[in-house]
Amino acid sequence: MSLSARNQLPGTVEQVHLGEIMARVVVRVGENLIESVITRQSVEDLGLAQGDEVRVVVKSTEVMIQKD
């Protein structure tokens, strides 16, 4: 998948906290943890789970998560 966003950080999913509508995903990037709040549907569509290798995509207005 190609993205125009340049701030892409490879990391590993540490935790996924599912709510009724939204979810909180915690990703380890090096020694740091980055949290992103995304829809529960996005977590399900991506099949995100602890241990998954992902990329955190940072834009000026949001933080997204990508799974290859």
Predicted features, each with a name:
Residues 1-68:
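Non-catalytic connector elements of ABC transporters
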